[in-house]
């Protein structure tokens, strides 16, 4: 299960990380977020070279605002601390995997 991070440790966990990080911006009340969660869990188990983290937009408004999160779920791919890709809304597993793999 991806680690939950927030305003206090986003920089260390994502921006200072070398390699690929998938950040799942979500909220506990969001239906599509609940649907995508098990897919993210599966991908984390399959893709050992990628770091997966989750940010609750209600608990971490600073990070959500910094990255312009308007709708959830929003998935952001970071590589070596740079935001290289973003998708909004529910996607099937294979599309999320392809999104990540193009930055590996």
Question: Which residue stretches match the model-derived regions?
Answer:
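Proteins that catalyze or organize thiol-disulfide redox chemistry
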Residues: 1-51, 58-104
């Amino acid at each position: 299960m991806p680690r939950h991070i927030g305003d206090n440790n986003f920089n260390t966990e994502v921006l200072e990380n070398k390699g690929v990080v998938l950040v799942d911006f979500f909220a506990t009340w969001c239906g599509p977020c609940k649907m995508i969660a098990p897919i993210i869990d599966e991908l984390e188990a399959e893709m050992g070279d990628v770091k997966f983290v989750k940010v609750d937009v209600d608990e971490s408004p600073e990070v959500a605002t910094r990255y312009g999160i308007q709708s959830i779920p929003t998935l952001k791919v970071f590589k070596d601390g740079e935001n290289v890709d973003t998708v909004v809304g529910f996607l099937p597993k294979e599309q999320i995997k392809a999104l990540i793999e193009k930055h590996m």
